[in-house]
Regions:
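PLP-dependent enzyme catalytic core of the Aspartate aminotransferase-like
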Residues: 148, 152-201
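A common structural junction motif
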Residues: 134-142, 176-181
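Short beta-strand-to-loop capping motifs
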Residues: 23, 119-123, 160
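Conserved active-site segment immediately N-terminal to the catalytic lysine
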Residues: 1-9
Length: 201
């Protein structure tokens, strides 16, 4: 991998606004020899300042850097393997619990993401109404689908500080919202199924 980048707000759970980037020696050499004519995305300029002064070419967002460092410290304190395990177990619990209340995951089991749980909408369930009811009544936010999946799926984030509390609360809120909208769901089955999975944390 020559270039790898992410967002600070993803599984690291820091505020958004920082994009950590890792660049191989080969990619760095290429970028220095072929700098872009723009100010933005000009990593060659960043390399020069960092290599010579350990500084950035422009004013850095220091509060975000402090928050990012603290988020990394929290991860290291928990232990990376524990962080990975917590994400995996919570994801499994969400998939299993939401399936038990009558929803179906969008992807086949072998293709599913751990960090984003995508589920198909039940027949007749309107995307905006469902998501706004879930947010207004239970303060649980989920995202809709993109492109040809818009209105067909919704996505539940399972990353960062996700915990058994978040899993159980999300399953309960989704089940209650579906019931409010006239769908027959089995919240107790969903919560019991998820609780069994969460014993692995």
């Amino acid at each position: 991998i020559d270039v790898c980048l992410t967002g600070s707000q993803k599984a690291i759970a820091a505020p958004p606004g920082i994009s950590p980037i890792s660049v191989s020696a080969k990619a760095k050499k290429f970028m220095i020899e072929n700098p872009p004519p723009t100010h933005y995305f000009n990593l060659a300029r960043y390399f020069k300042y960092y290599d010579e002064e350990k500084h950035t070419p422009f004013t850095p967002a220091l509060p975000l850097l402090y928050a990012y460092r603290e988020a990394l410290s929290i991860m290291l304190e928990e232990g990376l393997q524990n962080v990975f395990n917590r994400h995996k177990v919570c994801s499994d619990a969400l998939y299993s619990g939401l399936s038990a209340i009558g929803l179906t995951p969008f992807a086949k089991e072998e293709d599913r993401s751990i960090s984003i749980v995508a589920l198909n909408y039940l027949d007749g369930l309107e995307d905006k109404t469902f998501r706004s009811t879930l947010a207004d009544k239970f303060k649980v936010l989920v995202a809709g689908g993109f492109g040809n999946l818009k209105g067909k799926v919704f996505r539940v984030g399972c990353m960062g500080e996700v915990s058994p509390y978040h899993v159980m609360r999300t399953i309960s809120a989704i089940s209650s919202t579906l019931a409010m909208m006239g769908y027959d769901t089995d919240a107790a089955a969903g919560l019991k199924t998820a609780e069994e999975k969460l014993k692995d944390i």
